[in-house]
Amino acid sequence: MAETWGGRVLGGLTGVLVCALALLAAGCGVVTTKSDRKRAAELAEARYPGILDVLSARTLFPATSGSEVTFSVADDPDAAVLLRIDAAAGTCDRGPCDRALDEAVERGRSRAGELRRMRAAFTDCGYELVGATPALSAPWVAAAPTNATVTRVLAEIGACVRTWSPARDENGAPRRSVTVNIVAPGLARERPAGKATSPTVLRMTDPGLLGALAKRPHYSVSYTVRDGVVDPASGRAYLSFPWEDRRAFEKTVGDAVRDWLRTTRPRAGVAMVSGLWWLAPGTVDRLEGYVLFCDEAGGGARCAGDHAVALTVDPEGNPVGDFQVIRDVRDDHGRVRLPQE
């Protein structure tokens, strides 16, 4: 009896697991995009005849019903319209479908206009826009700064940002800074082109494209916004790494600081390598950052890192120049406060 009951439980659990996995694809006969896609097409033709064309539909997992349907826009090849629809419930975005579609079209056209404004600003400055984050808050551009040109390049890109950047972010809050990602022109040329029939906004924000651009180390530049206006001269760049490259970089830096501490503070222990390594002014091959350490390591106590070693390294993490100790870098709340961070 127990064995039979156990077998039934195991079989039931297996069935539940299989069904849960199947929900992602076919919904075990429950979750499907077919009816939602059909209803979305009917709604679009009735409200915007000849303008909207269904491109795709995806299940709103883990929801048990409803889909997100994507449309192209006949009179705007840059625009994409995204509508959440539940045909079974007769709702869109949990409300009336006519209103939801109107709002989705307005958002889609507005987003396309924002992308065009971003692209024009960088093109006019002489820099190619090769991608953008989905919220269109951080552009990706192609450039190859050198030690001789990096100051000029960052200022020129800053001027592009000043022309493009809105004073408020996507949530309506005042911007304090704007980030631009700089990728090598060679890598930009190798990026996936995407489907030529896809709206430009989808191709430029495609996760596959952004993943390809980020697969090698690249520069991320932060520009300060003052009184709603970007300061072009405020650009500070740091090196952004793919995961494996970051691990190797942090190990090289951490090992170097650990070896140096052994010669000056034998009982000290390394806590962590700081997250951002900024380009030293006027260079692309020198990075400035910090490694946190504690005076006493071992003894079962956790090394939180109350002090820091500041140093300059090359892009592989090898130290270049002197080490500088900065003591008591944590405030009364335990937060790390370091210069330039």
Model feature map: region roles:
Residues 51-85, 277-302:
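Exposed beta-strand-loop-beta-strand "reactive/processing" segments of non-cytosolic proteins
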Residues 214-308:
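Intrinsically disordered, low-complexity segments enriched in Gly and acidic/Ser/Thr residues
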Residues 2-29:
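Secretory targeting and sorting signals
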